[in-house]
């Protein structure tokens, strides 16, 4: 009997251990079983493309995923091609997309059958500043000088930007309304192309994100005139750039988010896995250095606070586009 009792305790203990292992395994069961398609709804060389191509090898370096992340650019229709592609992958957790404010602007401007609510939100990774840039050989050393020159010659100065009815054009319209001037707005497929147009003097100015122009700036090819925000960029190497208000007396601000979405209808476990993955990404020293080097503002956000942010950002974008005459 004593031996039988001992066996009973042993069997019971084994059952508890095995059950615990099975439960733990079930809670952490989901992970990618094939390469993840990392969709960038913009062209190569732009801020979104740069970020995605930084994140992909970072995930591999720190062994955060059992499968690689393959970056795929789908820039057509100001991001609509990429959004619709991901929307069409319903239930597939092996597709993600890196989104910008065109998540809101593109469907508002084009009527494309897409809304950010059609996808599964994962996380906001960072906020991106905008800066007014000119060619380094431009005679204009300050934003005030440049604005006065543009104001004196309406429809003479070219402002290059990414897409039509997107962030760059919205900011351009903000400037036109604030200062009573008029640019010739020239759209390009991506921020990299926009930056190159300024270097090649095919445009007179841009409002590129810092990450899109920093290489040209450090090489002495372009010049920042003002940060389009209420406060200066509080990062090494960027603090000397005045705000638009400091440079011109007129206050202007616009920040763009960078976020991650999954297709609709993916398993909750997959969504949670990606939330955890990108939280780990943002905790790496490489990520923190990347934010500093590219003048990106740390702003990790998930869950209900992320949904609230997206709703408010959508409303703001709609209001600005209406004021700018981009939508009715």
What annotation goes with each model-predicted range?
Residues 1-33, 328:
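Short, low-complexity disordered leader/linker segments with a strong preference
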Residues 61, 85-95, 107-193, 244, ...:
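Hinge/capping helix and adjacent helix->loop/strand transition within the periplasmic-binding protein
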Residues 127, 213-283, 312-315:
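C-terminal lobe and pocket-closing loops
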């Amino acid at each position: 009997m004593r031996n039988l009792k001992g066996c009973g305790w042993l069997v019971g203990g084994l059952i508890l251990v095995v059950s615990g292992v099975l439960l733990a395994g079930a809670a952490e069961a989901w992970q990618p079983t094939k390469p993840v398609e990392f969709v960038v709804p913009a062209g190569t060389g732009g801020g979104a493309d740069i970020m995605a191509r930084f994140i992909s090898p970072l995930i591999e370096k720190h062994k955060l995923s059992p499968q690689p992340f393959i970056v795929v650019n789908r820039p057509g229709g100001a991001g609509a091609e990429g959004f619709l592609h991901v929307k069409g992958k319903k239930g597939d957790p092996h597709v993600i997309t890196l989104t910008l404010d065109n998540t809101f602007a593109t469907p508002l401007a084009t009527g494309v059958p897409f809304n950010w609510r059609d996808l599964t939100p994962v996380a906001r990774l960072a906020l991106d500043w905008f800066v007014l840039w000119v060619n380094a050989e431009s005679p204009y050393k300050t934003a005030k000088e440049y604005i006065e020159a543009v104001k004196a010659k309406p429809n003479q100065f070219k402002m290059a930007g990414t897409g039509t009815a997107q962030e760059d054009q919205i900011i351009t319209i903000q400037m036109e309304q604030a200062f009573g001037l008029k640019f010739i707005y020239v759209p390009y497929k991506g921020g990299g192309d926009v930056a190159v147009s300024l270097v090649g003097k095919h445009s007179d100015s841009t409002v590129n994100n810092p990450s899109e122009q920093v290489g040209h700036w450090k090489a002495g090819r372009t010049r920042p005139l003002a940060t389009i925000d209420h406060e200066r960029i509080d990062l090494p190497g960027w603090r000397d750039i005045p705000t638009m208000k400091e440079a011109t007396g007129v206050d202007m601000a616009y920040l763009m988010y960078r976020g991650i979405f999954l297709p609709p209808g993916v398993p909750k476990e997959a969504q949670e896995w990606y939330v955890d993955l990108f939280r780990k990404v943002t905790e790496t020293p490489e990520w923190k250095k990347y934010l500093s080097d590219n003048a990106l503002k740390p702003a990790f956000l998930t869950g209900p606070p992320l949904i609230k942010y997206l709703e408010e950002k959508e409303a703001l974008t709609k209001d600005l586009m209406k004021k700018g005459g981009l939508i009715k």
